[in-house]
Amino acid sequence: MNMASYLIAQCGMKEEVYADYAERNITIYSCPYFALMLIDGSALEAEWIDEWLSERMRKRRGNEVNGTGDGSSSGRDDDGISRYINCYIFLSRHRSESNKPTLTSHSTGNFSHASMGGNARELAYTYPSLQKCYMLNLYSNRGKVPNYDIVIEATHHGPTSLAKPVLFIEIGSSEREWSDMDAVSVTCHSLLASIVNFKEYSKKVGVALGGTHYPEKFTNLLIDSDIALASVASKHNLKHIDESMLRQMIAKSIEPVRYIILDWKGLGGEKDRIVNL
């Protein structure tokens, strides 16, 4: 059982099937708190979701207005997306060469070229409070998965152009962990707790620069302090951080960013340049 099937069973979700968008087969399960979409293809290239949801909302609104059932309304329903959607959460399998058992989360974006979905030099919107809620709940359940590392990842890959914040929640790093029911249960219950009992941490939000792809210092900061994090750029991407990119990191948080947080020892040869941006 994977994360999606576990949530469907736990929440008694209602199923709707669609096969009318770009030859995609799309199944949506819904409950009072969220909707779960099963999609074909790579989540890293899911820039089309806004358009698909907008079209569905437009048709539904047209049906309600004219009563004909033909969906004869026109234009994208961007207002519907803004009104009814808060965030896109992708449930994903994490892969790494180490195959180390890991429970992780991260925002998405490309600081340079787009080799894994999204657009070059574009960051997705972030929801710092939601990621912090999730990581705190995950950490509180760590005793149930003692062999797993619990860590955030630096911002990477697509999608990058969705109209709402994007958060990837992942179990890794091999097939054994993907089907581990302890990991699936802890991940799903931590996510549900974060949605149902959401808490804002918007007073202290920062962007983070430096460290490794699995930034232990920033993970500890997220868990042990009242700070929430927006985009995180690892030391490997610091050469791509200029004033424009730093401004984008700040602007793409839906909660006001008040801090720029540096891993001082993890800035490498870019330290002087980054400090003087």
Show which residues each predicted segment covers.
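N-terminal catalytic or cofactor-binding beta/alpha core of small enzyme domains
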Residues: M1-H157, S161, S174-E175, M181-S185, ...
